[in-house]
């Protein structure tokens, strides 16, 4: 039986309809561009220019290099995430109709190109990450003259404050007024990264002004050598009273007063890499977070007069750190570094951790004693002040230099100066801990003298006779012996 090859009308219609659908898809389907790629194209970084040349209220310019925006607020309004706002020769100007802070809600870079940035607003608040670089700040408003990271990343590269204007304080948290955060989108991981040799700023606070901060803060000063940099606090602060009607006053307002009630809930990490600051204040023990301070230097570093309530201090980089004051804390030494406590009257630390196999040093004054309430861990070398060539300075005989609450896990090394070659550092159990003291005088040490006088200091002789003769010349010398060399 033969098959009927003739199509039925309904089959023909179905096939024509299928062909039409396929044809339509071929015509309308476009190449698919990944969403991230589309976003990258749409947000390609641009440079927007601003230069203040035409008056406080003149909104002019188009943001090009040849026709920059006159006012900074117009340049910022035209910017998007990832863009750079570039300040040209006459500087930037941000006007103010009120004392509210200026809100940065776009992740931009403000490049001063070595020019000034004049601001009349009551500070800056970040709702996202922002970078300022190569700028001289001119903050005129005496009310909350600060930059608030608000839990975000704030980068300051070669940023300084101009003379005659406000010192700008830096906060990891935000600004609160009547209990309200003036920033709309607070973060919880503030980063304050400051670099630049000529940096001069006010104080740095890990927390907020007039309120608490729920998060952690990292503060990094890298190769900052400005002489006027302020103090670093691991808490928030209370805003000082400012007479807002006294706009033209040239008097610098009082800095915000660090206040323990304005807490930081997370840890505060402070790192000073070849940088200077006046003082570092940690948080009190009843705060949830801890304060970690790292000194990274390859040279003798005495830039910080005092450290208060810092729970953990790390010294690394191979240099020596000599604080004038230091609360009891855990000291960690890395990379053949040293901590010099000779400036302190009664030094005390919680513990010392020497993180390397050798090379880390503890330095004390000749008559000092260090109280370590816990213990020493790792290989550590002890020496007194003014040591040279891997040897200690002059030490006292029979003097207790270390008092530990718990026995150290390894011996503390000690290499005496050449004049005290037989001296040793001996450990002795004491209750649950131990003491380390130098050995007693043995009677074989070199004689120590004082008030030495040469009675006939003038010697008359021909130089050639002295050079070519085996004749001896004697000098009459008097001195006072004060015992064996223990000084």
Question: Residue locations for each model-derived region?
Answer:
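N-terminal secretory signal peptides that target proteins for export/translocation
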Residues: 1-12
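Bacterial N-terminal signal peptides
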Residues: 18-28
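Sec-dependent signal peptide cleavage junction
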Residues: 26-44
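Acidic Gly/Asp/Thr-rich repetitive segments characteristic of extracellular carbohydrate-active
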Residues: 49-88
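Extracellular beta-strand-rich solenoid/capping regions of secreted or surface-exposed proteins
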Residues: 94-109, 116-156, 168, 172, ...
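All-beta strand scaffolds that present successive hydrophobic residues in beta-strands
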Residues: 110-112, 130-134, 153-162, 187-196, ...
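Acidic/polar low-complexity surface segments
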Residues: 137, 144, 165-184, 205-214, ...
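Conserved small/polar residues in nucleotide/adenosyl-binding loops
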Residues: 485-487
């Amino acid at each position: 039986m033969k098959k009927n090859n003739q199509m039925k009308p309904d089959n023909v219609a179905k096939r024509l309809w299928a062909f039409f659908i396929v044809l339509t898809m071929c015509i309308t389907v476009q190449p698919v561009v990944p969403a991230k790629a589309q976003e990258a194209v749409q947000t390609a970084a641009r440079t927007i220019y601003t230069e203040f040349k035409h008056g406080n209220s003149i909104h002019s310019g188009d943001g090009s290099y040849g026709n920059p925006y006159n006012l900074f607020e117009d340049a910022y309004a035209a910017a998007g995430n990832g863009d750079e706002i570039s300040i040209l020769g006459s500087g930037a100007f941000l006007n103010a109709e009120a004392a509210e802070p200026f809100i940065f809600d776009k992740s931009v870079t403000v490049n001063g190109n070595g020019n000034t940035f004049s601001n009349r607003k009551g500070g800056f608040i970040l709702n996202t990450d922002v970078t300022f670089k190569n700028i001289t700040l001119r903050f005129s408003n005496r009310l909350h003259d600060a930059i608030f990271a608000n839990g975000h990343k704030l980068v300051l590269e070669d940023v300084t404050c101009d003379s005659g204007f406000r010192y700008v304080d830096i906060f990891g948290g935000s600004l609160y007024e009547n209990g309200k955060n003036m920033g709309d989108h607070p973060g919880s991981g503030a980063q304050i990264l400051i670099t630049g040799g000529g940096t001069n700023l006010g104080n740095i606070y890990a927390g907020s002004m007039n309120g608490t901060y729920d998060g952690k803060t990292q503060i990094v000063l890298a190769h900052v050598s400005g002489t006027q940099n302020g103090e670093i606090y691991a808490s928030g602060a209370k805003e000082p009273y400012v007479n807002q009607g006294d706009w033209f006053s040239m008097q610098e307002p009082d800095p915000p007063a660090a206040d323990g009630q304005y807490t930081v809930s997370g840890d505060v990490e402070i790192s000073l890499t070849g940088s200077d600051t006046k003082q570092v204040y940690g948080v009190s023990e009843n705060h949830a977070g801890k304060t970690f301070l790292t000194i990274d230097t390859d040279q003798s570093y005495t830039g910080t007069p005092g450290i208060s309530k810092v729970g953990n201090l790390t010294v690394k980089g191979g240099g020596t750190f000599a604080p004038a004051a230091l609360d009891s804390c855990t000291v960690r030494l890395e990379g053949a570094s040293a901590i010099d406590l000779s400036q302190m009257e009664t030094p005390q630390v919680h513990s010392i951790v020497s993180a390397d196999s050798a090379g880390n040093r503890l330095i004390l004054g000749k008559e000092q004693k260090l109280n370590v309430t816990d213990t020493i861990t790792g290989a550590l070398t002890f020496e007194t002040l003014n040591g040279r060539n891997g040897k200690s300075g002059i030490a006292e005989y029979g003097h207790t230099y270390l008092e530990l609450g718990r026995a150290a896990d390894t011996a503390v090394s000690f290499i005496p100066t050449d004049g005290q070659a037989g001296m040793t550092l001996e450990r002795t159990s004491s209750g649950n801990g131990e003491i380390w003291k130098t050995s007693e005088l043995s009677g074989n040490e070199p004689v120590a003298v004082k008030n030495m006088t040469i009675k006939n200091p003038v010697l008359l002789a021909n130089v050639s006779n002295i050079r070519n003769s085996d004749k001896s010349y004697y000098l009459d010398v008097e001195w006072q012996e004060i015992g064996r060399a223990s000084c």
